[in-house]
Amino acid sequence: HSTMVPTAVSQIFEQIVNAVISLLAAKSLFDLGMKSNLVYGSTEYSYAFGAAGGALGTGAGALTALILFVGLYLMYRPKMKRRIRKEQGTSAEGYGMITSTLFLTVVPIIVSSSLYNSSTVIDNVLFGQIMTGLGEAKQIASQWGIYSGKYHLLFNIPVAVANSLSSSLIPALSRAVAEKDRKQTLNRIASAIRFSMIIAIPSAVGLAVLAAPISNLLFPGRDNTDLIKMTCYGSSAVVVYSLSTVTNAVLQGINRMKTPIRNAGISLVLHTVILFVMLRYLHMGIYGVLYANILFALFICILNARSIARFKRYRQEVKKTFLTPMVASAVMGAAAFGVYRAAYSVFGNLISTGISVLVAVAVYFVLLILLKGVDAQELRSMPGGTRLSGLARKLHLMR
C-alpha cells in the first residue's frame, strides 16, 4: 500500500505498552524482591527482580504490535481482495520469486538489527565480569537494574516516536530510487533525517532538563539519584540512536542492504574496545556502559553518513536539520525548567511536570515554525501533520 503509517503507529504503541508494563512489573517484582531480601539477608534480590520485571515490557510491547498488525491486516483484507480481482489480467510473480525477494530483503535487515542490539548483551557480560574482578560485585545488580530497567525505558520512547515519523517517508524514498529521480531521492533522504531530528533533539533536551521530575513521577518512593544522573548525562543517546536508526533505514531504502551490517559490525568492535577500557582502566562503572553506548550509536551515524554521501553524493543540510531544532530546544528547555520550578511549590510534582511538558511542546512548536525549521508542506507530510498545519494557520504562524 506504499505506506509506513501503520508501522509508525505500531512502534509508538509498542513503546507505550513497553513502558507501562515495565513500570508495573518492575514495581511488583521489586516489592517481591524486598521480601526475599529480608528472608536471605541481602539487598540485591529487589534490584534483580525489578530488572527482570522491566524486561517483561519488551515482550508485551512486541505482542501489542503484532496484534495491531493482525487487526490492520484483517481490516484491509477486503480492499486487498478487490485489488487482486482488478489485477487478475496482469501477470503474477511466482511464489519462488516472491520468497527469494523477501529473503534477500529481510535477512540483511535482521542481521543488521541483531548486531545493532547485541551491544546490550556485550555490555551485560563485560560489566558483570569486570566489575566482579574489580571487587565491585555488590553494585552490579542495582546499577544494571537502574540502567536497563529504568534509563532505557525513558530514552526508548522518544527514539521510537522520532523513528516512526521519519520511517513513514521511506516508501517515498524507495519509489524515488526506483524511478531514478535523483532530486526526489535527495529530498526524501533530507526529509527523513530532518523529521527524526525535529523530534529527537527536543526530546533529549526535555529529558535532561526534567530528569528529576520525570524520574520521581515514574518511580515514586525510590532513591532516583543514579537514574537522574544517567538520564541527564545520557540524554544525548536519544539523538544519536534516532539518527543511526533512520540512516540505517535510508541505506535500506536506497537498496544498500549490506552496508548497515558492515557499519554496525565496525561500530560494535569499537564499542567493545572502548567499553573494556572505560570499565577496566578508567573505573567508570555503569557510566562507562552509558557513554560507550552513546559512542556506539555515534559511530554508526558517522559511518552511515559517509556511506549515504558516497552512494548518492548527498550533502547533509545543517541549519534546518540540526541548528534550528537545537536553538528552539534550548529556549524550550529553559521555559520548561522555569515553569516547573514556579509551579512545583504550588501544585507538587505530578501537575507541575504535566504543565511544564505542555509548555515545552507549545514553545517548541511555535519557535520551530517561527525560525522556519519546517514549512507547511513538510509539516503536512508528517503523520498527523494536516491537523498541525491547520493549528499553525489558526495561530497565524503559517499562511
Stretches with model-predicted labels:
Residues H1-Q11, S236-I266:
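Membrane-interface junctions at transmembrane-helix termini in multi-pass inner-membrane proteins
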Residues V5, I16-I67, L72, K258, ...:
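Membrane-interface helix-loop junctions in multi-pass transport and translocation proteins
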Residues K35-T90, M97-L102, R188-L218, I286-K312, ...:
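Short alpha-helical transmembrane segments in multi-pass integral membrane proteins
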Residues V111-P158, R175, S215-R222, A342:
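Helix-terminus/linker motif at the lipid-water interface of multi-pass membrane proteins
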Residues V159-E179:
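Helix-loop junctions and terminal segments of transmembrane helices
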Residues A208-V238:
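Interfacial segments at transmembrane-helix termini and the short loops linking adjacent helices
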Residues T247-N255, A305-T321, Y344, V374:
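Alpha-helical transmembrane segments
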Residues G338-R399:
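Membrane-proximal transmembrane or re-entrant/amphipathic helices at the cytosolic face
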